Amino acid sequence: MSENTFLVEIGTEELPPKALRSLAESFAANVTAELDNAGLAHGKVEWFAAPRRLALKVANLAAAQADREVEKRGPAIAQAFDAEGKPSKAAEGWARGCGITVDQAERLTTDKGEWLLYRAHVKGESTEALLPNMIASSLAKLPIPKLMRWGASDVHFVRPVHTVTLLLGDKVIPATILGIPSDRVIRGHRFMGEPEFTIDHADQYPQILLERGKVIADYEQRKAKIKADAEEAARKIGGQADLSESLLEEVTSLVEWPVVLTAKFEEKFLGVPSEALVYTMKGDQKYFPVYDNAGKLLPNFIFVANIESKDPQQIISGNEKVVRPRLADAEFFFNTDRKKRLEDNLPRLETVLFQQQLGTLRDKTDRIQALAGWIAGQIGADVNHATRAGLLSKCDLMTNMVFEFTDTQGVMGMHYARHDGEAEDVAVALNEQYQPRFAGDALPSNPVACAVAIADKMDTLAGIFGIGQHPKGDKDPFALRRAALGVLRIIVEKNLNLDLQTLTEEAVRLYGEKLTNANVVDDVIDFMLGRFRAWYQDEGYGVDTIQAVLARRPTRPADFDARMKAVSHFRTLEESSALAAANKRVSNILAKSDETLNDIVHASVLKEAAEIKLAGNLVVLRDKLQPYFAAGRYQDALIELAALREPVDEFFENVMVNAEDKDVRINRLTLLSKLRELFLQVADISLLQ
C-alpha cells in the first residue's frame, strides 16, 4: 500500500439526488485546483458519490511542496534612503513585509539602477499541514444554492455532516472540517452490512466500503449496474426499459446498494394516454416504464430498491400499491375531462394571469390565434387550422389532468382535441406548440404546428420585452432565451420565409396599448440575433465569422443561415485572407475620408491601368451577382468575388488612392466603396481574422 494515497470522505445525511453528481465533480475539481495552485505533485484524482457521502482519492500525492527561492524587489535606492542615509518609510514598510530590517536587505544593481532586494530560500510546507485548509476551501466553493444549518452550531452545508475521514496513507490528518473532527470512521449502509467501521489505509477505499458497508461508492459503477440490470429485467418480460439519462442519474443518486425489481399494474389503465401514466411513474415514483418492441407501453414497470430483501415480493407489492392510486387518478381525470369539449375551457382562461401587465391566458390565446393565422399565411400553412389551433392552444391547462400532472400540458390537449374530432394537424399543434423544449429537441412536425409554436414564443418575447423585463445575467424567469432560440431553429431548420422584423412588429401590434417600451421591436430583434451568436458558436463557427454576418443585421433567419454557410465556405478559399485584409484596408481608408463620394465611378477620370482593370471587373461582377444576391446564393457570389484578389492586389500595389487631384482622389475612393459594397451584400469580411 502506498503512503502517498490521500482519501477524504464527508459522511452526510441524504444529499439532494439531482445535485449529487455536480457536487462530487465540483469537489474533485476544487481539490485538484488547490493541489495544483499549491504546487503539490499528484496522480489521478478519483471522485466517489453516494446518497450519504462525497469522497475523493488522490494517488501519488507529494509529501510536501518543493523548496523554492523567493526574490522580492524593494524601492530604488534613491527612494529607499533620505539625504542623511536614513531608511525611508517606504523602505521600512517593504522590509517589514519581508520580515527583515532594511540593513539586512541585499542590493540589486542593473543597467537601469539599484534597488533593495530580499532573497530567501523558502522550505516547502508539508502536505499534511496544507490539506485541511484545502479541503475546507474546496467544500466552501461547492455549487450549493441553499445551505442548511443543524444542531446548535453555526456550520452550514448542503446537508448535516456526521463523519469526516482524512487519511494520508495509513495516517489520520488532524483537522476539524464542517465542525466534525477528522477520524478513520466510515458509515456503511443504513440497513445492510456494518453500520460503522474503521478504515486502516486510504488504498482500502472504496473496496472496504463495498465489502463491509454494502455501499457501492463508485457512482459510475452503480449507474452501470442499474442500467444493465434494468435492461435485463425488461428483456425477461419481452420489453425495453425507458432508461432516460436524467432519471437514471437521479435513481443512481438515490441508492447505495441498487437492487432492480419488476412490478406490474392493471391493464385497464392502458386506456389512459401513456404520457400521463409515464409522468406518474417517472416523475412521482422514479420508476422506469417498459415498452414493447413496437413502442407501446406495457403494464409493467421497473424500480430500484436500496436494499437486498429476503422477501422481494413484499417490496414489489408495496410499490404496486403505491402507484395504483396515482394511475387511478389519471384514469378518473381523463374520463372526467372528456365529458366536455376542449373549447369549453376557454372562459376559465380568463381567471389565470399570464402576466399582470399583459393580461390573462385568455388574452394570450387571442393573440396567439391571430398571430398563428398571420404566420400561416406567410409560410403557406392552412390559415383556418392555424387560427383554430391558436384558439385551443391553452385550453388543456384548465383540465383536471394537466392541473394534477403538469408535465402533460400540450400532449393532453392533443388527445382531447382528437377526441373532439378536431383536424389532425390542429391536434398535433396543441402538443408541438412547446417544441423545441430544450437543446436538441424535435421541432414541430407540420406547418400548422410551426405557426402556433412560433406565435406562442413570439407573443411571450414581445410582451415581456415590451414591459422592459428582459433577461438579466443568468435570470430568465420567462425562458426568453429558450423561446428565441426555438423560433430561430424552427425558421432556419424548416426553411420558413419569415422576417424577424415583420414578425416582431405583428406580435407587438397585437398587444395594442399594453406595451410601454417604445424600442420593443429593435430590442427583441437584437436579442434574437444575439441568440444566433450563441447558436452558431455551439455549432463550431468562429466568432469572427458570426460577427461578419451580424454586421449586416440580416433579419430573415433562413437568410442569416445562408450567409453563415457562405462566409464559412469563403474562409476555405485561398483568396479569402488577402481579400479580408483588403476589405479591412478599404474600410479604414473610407472611414478616414470625410469627402463626399460620387454616385458612380467615372470611367473618364480613371488613369492607371490597375484602376481601370478593377473598375471593369466590378461592373461585370455587379451585373452578374445581382440575381445571386436576390436568390440568396451567397456562397456562389463569394466564390465569384474571390476572383477579385488579383485586380485588388494590383490596385493597391500600383495606385495612389489619395491623389492630389481631387477628382481623381474622389473617383478612386468611390471605386473602393463600390468594391466594399459588393462584399457587404453578403457580410463584412473585413472582420475576418
UniProtKB/Swiss-Prot annotation:
Give UniProt keywords alphabetically. Aminoacyl-tRNA synthetase, ATP-binding, Cytoplasm, Ligase, Nucleotide-binding, Protein biosynthesis
State where it is primarily located.
Answer: cytoplasm
**This protein's GO CC annotations:** cytosol
Check the record and name the SUPFAM superfamilies matching this protein. HD-domain/PDEase-like
Localization, per the record, is: Cytoplasm
E.C. number, please?
Answer: 6.1.1.14
| Membrane spanning residue stretches | none
| InterPro entries hit by this protein | DALR_anticod-bd, Gly-tRNA-synth_bsu, Gly-tRNA-synth_heterodimer
One record GO biological process: arginyl-tRNA aminoacylation
What's its catalytic activity?
tRNA(Gly) + glycine + ATP = glycyl-tRNA(Gly) + AMP + diphosphate
UniProt GO MF annotations: arginine-tRNA ligase activity; ATP binding; glycine-tRNA ligase activity
Instruction: Kindly indicate whether the keyword Nucleotide-binding belongs to this entry.
Output: yes
Name of a matching Pfam family? tRNA_synt_2f
Could you confirm whether the keyword Protease appears in this record?
no
Record text on subunit structure and interactions: Tetramer of two alpha and two beta subunits.
Q: Which family does it belong to?
A: Belongs to the class-II aminoacyl-tRNA synthetase family.
What protein name is recorded for this chain?
Glycine--tRNA ligase beta subunit
Organism annotation: Klebsiella pneumoniae (strain 342)
